Swiss-Prot record:
Keywords from the UniProt entry: ATP-binding, Ligase, Nucleotide-binding, Protein biosynthesis
The organism's taxonomic lineage, starting at the top: Bacteria, Pseudomonadati, Chlorobiota, Chlorobiia, Chlorobiales
PANTHER family: GLUTAMYL-TRNA(GLN) AMIDOTRANSFERASE SUBUNIT C, MITOCHONDRIAL (PTHR15004:SF0)
Subunit structure: Heterotrimer of A, B and C subunits.
NCBIfam families per the UniProt record, alphabetical: gatC
Gene Ontology MF terms in the entry: asparaginyl-tRNA synthase (glutamine-hydrolyzing) activity; ATP binding; glutaminyl-tRNA synthase (glutamine-hydrolyzing) activity
Protein name: Aspartyl/glutamyl-tRNA(Asn/Gln) amidotransferase subunit C
One of the GO biological process terms: translation
Organism: Chlorobium phaeobacteroides (strain DSM 266 / SMG 266 / 2430)
Entry EC number(s): 6.3.5.-
Family: Belongs to the GatC family.
Length: 95
C-alpha cells in the first residue's frame, strides 16, 4: 500500500493541518516509509503462535478490600497549619 499526496491532503484536512508543497512531499515520503516498515510484519511466520491480547497471564490483579480503622477528621485537622470548621484552609491560588 502506498500513500499519495491526495491521501496526505485528506488526512491533513481531517486533522485540521495545513502543509505547504515541501511539507506535503515530505509527509508523503515519511508515511510511505512508515507503511513499508509496518508491512514487514506480514513477512513474520506466525504459524502455530497462539493469539494473545496481553503479555501478562493475569488481569486486574487487585488487593483484597479489607476495612481498616483510620484516624478521625479531628485528628487529621490537628496537623493542619490553618483550618476552617472541618476543612483545611489553603491560600487562594486562582484569581
Amino acid at each position: 500500500m502506498s500513500v499519495t499526496k491526495k491521501d496526505v491532503a485528506y488526512i491533513a484536512e481531517l486533522a485540521r493541518l495545513k502543509f505547504g508543497d515541501t511539507e506535503m512531499e515530505t509527509m508523503t515520503v515519511e508515511l510511505n516509509n512508515i507503511l513499508h516498515y509496518i508491512d514487514k510484519l506480514n513477512e513474520v511466520d506466525t504459524e502455530g503462535v497462539q493469539p494473545l491480547s496481553s503479555i501478562h497471564d493475569e488481569s486486574n490483579v487487585l488487593r483484597a478490600d479489607i476495612e481498616k480503622t483510620s484516624i478521625s477528621t479531628d485528628q487529621v485537622l490537628l496537623n493542619a497549619p490553618d483550618r476552617q470548621d472541618r476543612f483545611f484552609k489553603v491560600p487562594k491560588v486562582i484569581g
